[in-house]
Amino acid sequence: MPNGKYAAHRLQQVRKDARWKDTGYSRRTLGLDIKSDPLSGAPQGRGIVLEKVGVEAKQPNSAIRKCVRIQLIKNGRQATAFCPGDGAINFIDEHDEVTVERIGGRMGGAMGDIPGVRFKVIAVNNVSLREMVIGRKEKPRR
């Protein structure tokens, strides 16, 4: 490592090269998280329900978390989304259009005891899932 009166340019260059060893910097600079994200960096996305799936909760909990497998409209990618609320899965059928958002886990990952599920359903056919669960709104008949 140079040190002296005329070493500034070389020191800057060394710093610049060393930054690429930091995974956070390199992923951020190359936009890798946005490229690998099914929603492509958007806060929400719409998708078509392919099937209903039950995801087993991680230890020490014992439950089957009700989720849906969806295909996003914007890019055709598939993802699994959690259906929050008591009996919420009953308001969702195959081929319905759902709106999903991130579930809120740390570093964009899964949350709590649901492994591999990074999204949650917030609306079915443009009607809020929460409103349907508490009985304030009905699912529109197509």
Curated annotation (Swiss-Prot):
Keywords: Ribonucleoprotein, Ribosomal protein, RNA-binding, rRNA-binding. Coiled coil: none annotated. Signal peptide: none annotated. It holds the Pfam family Ribosom_S12_S23. One of its GO terms (cellular component) is small ribosomal subunit. HAMAP family: Ribosomal_uS12_A. With S4 and S5 plays an important role in translational accuracy. Located at the interface of the 30S and 50S subunits. This is Small ribosomal subunit protein uS12. It comes from Methanococcoides burtonii (strain DSM 6242 / NBRC 107633 / OCM 468 / ACE-M). The lineage of its organism: Archaea, Methanobacteriati, Methanobacteriota, Stenosarchaea group, Methanomicrobia.
